[in-house]
Amino acid sequence: MPNHQSGSPTGSSDLLLSGKKQRPHLALRRKRRREMRKINRKVRRMNLAPIKEKTAWQHLQALISEAEEVLKTSQTPQNSLTLFLALLSVLGPPPVTGESYWAYLPKPPILHPVGWGSTDPIRVLTNQTMYLGGSPDFHGFRNMSGNVHFEGKSDTLPICFSFSFSTPTGCFQVDKQVFLSDTPTVDNNKPGGKGDKRRMWELWLHTLGNSGANTKLVPIKKKLPPKYPHCQIAFKKDAFWEGDESAPPRWLPCAFPDKGVSFSPKGALGLLWDFSLPSPSVDQSDQIKSKKDLFGNYTPPVNKEVHRWYEAGWVEPTWFWENSPKDPNDRDFTALVPHTELFRLVAASRHLILKRPGFQEHEMIPTSACVTYPYAILLGLPQLIDIEKRGSTFHISCSSCRLTNCLDSSAYDYAAIIVKRPPYVLLPVDIGDEPWFDDSAIQTFRYATDLIRAKRFVAAIILGISALIAIITSFAVATTALVKEMQTATFVNNLHRNVTLALSEQRIIDLKLEARLNALEEVVLELGQDVANLKTRMSTRCHANYDFICVTPLPYNATEDWERTRAHLLGIWNDNEISYNIQELTNLISDMSKQHIDAVDLSGLAQSFANGVKALNPLDWTQYFIFIGVGALLLVIVLMIFPIVFQCLAKSLDQVQSDLNVLLLKKKKGGNAAPAAEMVELPRVSYT
């Protein structure tokens, strides 16, 4: 754009563009503005009015404790004056002073409780695949942390088992159950090598019990997913027998849909269904006793009912979670969430007890079971675990608990809660007073273009100094409040970088083929999550200054109640009433990222920068310097002539005044203006 004719240079514009090029450009701008206004309206609709709580005595006590901690940290002696100043430092500063945006934090260093309503499969590996089935855990490490305090929230009832006589609220009590199955004897003289006799295998393991007030033995018919076939149809008698009398029966992944048994958690709603009982309401002991000769004089357990005897093998106790239906009489159409491998984890809490065919003594088999990444197990004493439902959310806390990835018989006196490392969280961060940008080079051009203009250059200096003073002033007094609420983007970025480098997952592959395949599967699943994170990162416009987190262009309303963000970080993902709907936030971030993709007009920005640099050409500024010089010269001339003119005017005024006085004296009576004696004729002076 050519220089302005009246003096100061201006920035570039598109006023000189032709009409054909200008109209589509303006239409695109209007379309973007309309879309951004729609997104902003969605953000405002998602905002929740903060809940005003009345000040209570415990709030004042907590405030005084924070003030005392401030004095202790700063090593200031405590008295009434310093305590009052510390209270002001805690109450006064705002949580953040700059711009706040939502940041995408992949694989954060936090754990969320896993609810029974979670559809993600939980894999369990064991060291006794012969007697528990499943996959071996030869490749994994077993880790145990020190005592930790855990706090979390869940949309559904958390997965919790109690291996002790005491059961926390919301947990399931486990009990020792007997599993029976029979295999044929070997007789090479018979067709197929099968003899006329049967060999009974007796296995005791801990699972959900079928006795007690929280168990209903009344069979009910349910519609199960197709992957869980009917046992009597899918697995026939002796279908897997290979002629080895020493080989134990196999675990069968099937169910009896018309013979379900429900279990209720202590003090909570919801049902856990087990369809692995061939005879849930009838004791099979009498049937076995009637065929005592067929089973080699086998005697069933005394004082223990038998409900899990199946000839084809041991049926896996697949548990199905059912939320409390609105109509208790209409359970057939309620959705069920399967959990196929958790029974192995519960069984490992005690030794397996095996009685082989033909043996009189029982054999104790030590067992361990481990969960795979990203899951872990929270172990704690039942009296130190608290699960409370508030509204539609479950609040979980555990004091002096330990985190581990494996269970064995040492957990017999504890309760266990399944936790999970989330794939990502959305965290509001403060980026200070700098603007949001996703390209450093383009932002540099913008800075340079803005600084070219003289008025904006001076304003930028003033605002920069003011912002620096504000940051330095607020940092000292806002430290305590800042750590309780929103962190800066730099802090979160450094934290995640350290966690990523320190907690990078190592996978050790064992020589055994099956263990290698299991490890490879875990690696593939983890890589799949990493690929999903990379896909999200590539499709989202991120702030250019932070490499280990993605500061998105979606602004965060810092006036909202921090409890909503805290609820999300503790495990709530899809509840607009107490937290944020993460799917809606993700969609908003995606929409804003799409708007930012085409928002930068590189050609226009380059043209603007070129015009601004051209405006700084000294040759173009010569006319302004000439005008300024001429004006200054005229000002100097005026200042020099003004005293002379003023002196002449003063003399003229004096002469006029003298003439007026003489004229007045002549008009007086008495003749001449002066006495005759005093009148003296002055000599005439000739100048020639």
Curated annotation (Swiss-Prot):
UniProt-annotated site: Involved in binding to the cell receptor, residues? 138
Q: Please list the GO terms describing molecular function.
A: structural molecule activity
Q: Where is this region: Immunosuppression?
A: 463-481
Return the GO cellular component terms, semicolon-separated: host cell plasma membrane; membrane; viral envelope; virion membrane
Residue ranges under compositional bias (Polar residues)?
1-15
Site positions (Cleavage): 454-455
| Topological domain spans for side Extracellular | 99-624
The lineage is:
Viruses, Riboviria, Pararnavirae, Artverviricota, Revtraviricetes
Q: What does this protein do?
A: The surface protein (SU) attaches the virus to the host cell by binding to its receptor. This interaction triggers the refolding of the transmembrane protein (TM) and is thought to activate its fusogenic potential by unmasking its fusion peptide. Fusion occurs at the host cell plasma membrane. The transmembrane protein (TM) acts as a class I viral fusion protein. Under the current model, the protein has at least 3 conformational states: pre-fusion native state, pre-hairpin intermediate state, and post-fusion hairpin state. During viral and target cell membrane fusion, the coiled coil regions (heptad repeats) assume a trimer-of-hairpins structure, positioning the fusion peptide in close proximity to the C-terminal region of the ectodomain. The formation of this structure appears to drive apposition and subsequent fusion of viral and target cell membranes.
Protein name (record) = Envelope glycoprotein gp70
Signal sequence coordinates: 1-98
Q: Which residues form a coiled coil?
A: 426-474, 511-541
Q: Does the keyword Disulfide bond apply?
A: yes
Q: How is it modified after translation?
A: Specific enzymatic cleavages in vivo yield mature proteins. Envelope glycoproteins are synthesized as an inactive precursor that is N-glycosylated and processed likely by host cell furin or by a furin-like protease in the Golgi to yield the mature SU and TM proteins. The cleavage site between SU and TM requires the minimal sequence [KR]-X-[KR]-R.
Q: Where is this region: Fusion peptide?
A: 457-477
- Sites of glycosylation? 127, 143, 498, 557
- Biased segments, Basic residues type: 20-31
CDD domains to which the protein is assigned, alphabetical: HIV-1-like_HR1-HR2 (cd09909)
User: What Pfam families is this protein classified in?
Assistant: GP41
> Which Gene Ontology BP annotations are present?
fusion of virus membrane with host plasma membrane; symbiont entry into host cell; virion attachment to host cell
